[in-house]
From Swiss-Prot:
Keywords of the record: Capsid protein, T=3 icosahedral capsid protein, Virion
Source taxonomy: Viruses, Riboviria, Orthornavirae, Kitrinoviricota, Alsuviricetes
Record-linked InterPro entries: Tymo_coat, Viral_coat
GO MF term set: structural molecule activity
Task of the protein: Self-assembles to form a T=3 icosahedral capsid composed of 180 copies of the capsid protein. The capsid encapsulates the single-stranded RNA genome. A pentameric unit may be lost during decapsidation.
Source taxon at top rank: Viruses
Name of protein: Capsid protein
Length: 189
């Protein structure tokens, strides 16, 4: 049985994204702003942390008055303190997308996860830097919609059984934000 007519006529609108023209006009003015935040004082006890970068206070404060914000660069630094030589501390770090089910206990089972011994007689006392592979996750931390795959940092700390009274290392997150499209808000208060 053949059907000679179209039962439900279809609109012939072109909807392929590469064919649609871009909105005319200049690119938005972009502001680049560095940030750094202390996220953990470690070494006095065992600890685990899972930090979504968009939720870090310094990042959310900087992006408050902008509609769009992306990470240009991002890294974690482990800074040994004067307690480190006498009280070595094991620090594990791993960058994953925020929606990843990976937990801090799975750092060595995850691509890019690293474990460091901070302090001790023969270990490094220099700061250690681990860069976030932004090309492997979404660098957008603020937009008109919420993304679930922006960077998240997993941290695992194993302290000495006889831990010191003060931290053996300080962990900071640093980077550069690119922000544009200021929000129209009342700034008179």
């Amino acid at each position: 049985m053949e059907i000679d007519k179209e039962l439900a006529p279809q609109d012939r609108t072109v909807t392929v994204a590469t064919v649609l023209p871009t909105v005319p006009g200049p690119s938005p003015f972009t502001i680049k702003q560095p940030f750094q935040s202390e996220v953990l004082f470690a070494g006095t006890k065992d600890a685990e942390a899972s930090l979504t970068i968009a939720n870090i206070d310094s990042v959310s404060t900087l992006t408050t008055f902008y509609r769009h914000a992306s990470l240009e660069s991002l890294w974690v630094t482990i800074h040994p303190t004067l307690q480190a030589p006498a009280f070595p501390t094991t620090v594990g770090v791993c960058w994953v997308p925020a929606n990843s089910p990976v937990t801090p206990t799975q750092i060595t089972k995850t691509y890019g996860g690293q474990i460091f011994c901070i302090g001790g007689a023969i270990n490094t006392l220099s700061p250690l830097i681990v860069k976030c592979p932004l090309e492997m996750m979404n660098p957008r931390v603020k937009d008109s919609i919420q993304y679930l795959d922006s960077p998240k940092l997993l941290i695992s700390i194993t302290a000495q059984p006889t831990a010191p009274p003060a931290s053996t290392c300080i962990i900071t997150v640093s980077g550069t934000l690119s922000m544009h499209s200021p929000l129209i808000t009342d700034t008179s208060t």
